[in-house]
């Protein structure tokens, strides 16, 4: 904890500098700079407040120890001992909270995401399960106050999806859904199964942060653009002009379709923004050395082929294989109640990071 405390002293000094800057008329008049400083100050506020409380409690404990060792009044001594008993519990809790707050932040945690779900092994049943997963995430997004927008889809005749991509926007979306990367396995009796046998199918989920400003230039020659009429439910055309846009990045095969915006130009701009995000994420993922090391320290590799979770319908059971968590409430989880799983994954990640921090400070 000593190394962490040394870091905290520097952090508090920087926090106080930020507060002084926020009172500077020159900064106040520069809206962009003021907003940047204000956000940095807000991000640091909780850990600074807890550290100040921690230091205050330590001082109070020391003062009480002085009373205990020198005071002749037994009542005062007992009072000091009782106070220290409570303060020491509070200090231990504050230490744990401060350690978690001092963990390295994932720079993408505040970002919106692009989620792609694909029916994998299992044919029609896999495509149906891909649709079930999409609805699960849509319901979870609703509980979080997030917005889900369709980017592109490839529906199947049975009512599922061979592939569907959505954008999910809101507060800290990536921080919660980044753990969904991987292969999701389902065990259930398909609606087409006459013998009542349980089949196993899989769908893969890929979660990518959406980058508002991506430092990547795409060669126009590498992009094929198709325009077509927007279509609504059941495939009926809802727009007489060709306002929908599909962009294909030929070197990677990444496809983005956009029809949510009001005009073809707006659809082009949004499609290009999403395409840049996805191509950027694709090339970032090619450099796997550092990427894999980071992901393995947290929860698995995040590879789409890695089986992360099994949904067993006959037994109403969901198992997350990365952390060995089993919950007998599949019906509620498929209805969007994902918090218990996500919170357990976050805790697992934090515990691993804390263990690493302890080794470094040993």
From Swiss-Prot:
Keywords: Cytoplasm, Methylation, Protein biosynthesis. The lineage of its organism: Bacteria, Bacillati, Bacillota, Bacilli, Lactobacillales. Peptide chain release factor 1 directs the termination of translation in response to the peptide chain termination codons UAG and UAA. This is Peptide chain release factor 1. InterPro entries: PCRF, Pep_chain_release_fac_I, Pep_chain_release_fac_I_sf, Prokaryotic/Mito_RF, RF-1. Belongs to the prokaryotic/mitochondrial release factor family. It comes from the Bacteria. SUPFAM superfamilies: Release factor. GO terms for cellular component: cytoplasm. It is found in: Cytoplasm. The gene is prfA. Methylated by PrmC. Methylation increases the termination efficiency of RF1. Pfam families: PCRF, RF-1. The modification N5-methylglutamine is found at residue 236. GO terms for molecular function: translation release factor activity, codon specific. Its main location: cytoplasm.
């Amino acid at each position: 904890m000593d190394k962490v405390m040394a870091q905290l002293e520097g952090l508090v000094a920087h926090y106080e500098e930020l507060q002084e800057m926020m009172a500077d008329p020159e900064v106040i008049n520069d809206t962009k700079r003021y907003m940047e400083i204000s956000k940095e100050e807000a991000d640091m506020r909780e850990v600074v407040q807890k550290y100040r409380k921690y230091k205050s409690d330590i001082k109070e404990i020391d003062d009480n120890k002085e009373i205990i060792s020198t005071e002749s009044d037994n009542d005062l001594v007992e009072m000091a001992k009782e106070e220290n008993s409570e303060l020491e519990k509070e200090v231990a809790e504050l230490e744990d909270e401060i350690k978690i707050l001092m963990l390295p932040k994932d720079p993408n945690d505040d970002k919106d995401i692009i989620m792609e779900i694909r029916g994998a092994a299992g044919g029609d049943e896999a495509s149906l399960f891909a649709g079930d997963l999409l609805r699960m995430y849509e319901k979870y997004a609703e509980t979080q106050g997030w917005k889900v927008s369709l980017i592109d889809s490839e529906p199947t005749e049975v009512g599922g999806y061979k592939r569907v991509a959505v954008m999910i926007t809101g507060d800290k979306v990536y921080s919660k859904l980044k753990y969904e990367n991987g292969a999701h396995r389902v065990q259930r009796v398909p609606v087409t199964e006459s013998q009542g046998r349980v089949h196993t199918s899989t769908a893969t989920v890929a979660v990518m942060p959406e980058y508002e400003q991506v430092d990547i230039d795409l060669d126009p020659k590498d992009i094929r653009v198709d325009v077509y009429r927007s279509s609504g439910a059941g495939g009926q055309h809802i727009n007489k002009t060709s306002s929908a846009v599909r962009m294909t990045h030929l070197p990677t095969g990444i496809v983005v379709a956009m029809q949510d915006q009001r005009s073809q130009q707006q659809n082009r701009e949004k499609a290009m923004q999403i395409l840049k995000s996805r191509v950027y994420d694709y090339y970032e993922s090619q450099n796997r050395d550092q990427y894999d090391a980071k992901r393995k320290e947290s929860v698995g590799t995040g590879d789409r082929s890695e089986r992360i979770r099994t949904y067993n319908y006959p037994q109403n059971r969901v198992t997350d294989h990365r952390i060995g968590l089993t919950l007998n409430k599949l019906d509620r989880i498929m209805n969007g109640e994902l918090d218990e799983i996500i919170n357990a994954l976050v805790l697992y990640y934090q515990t691993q990071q804390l263990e690493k921090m302890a080794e470094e400070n040993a």
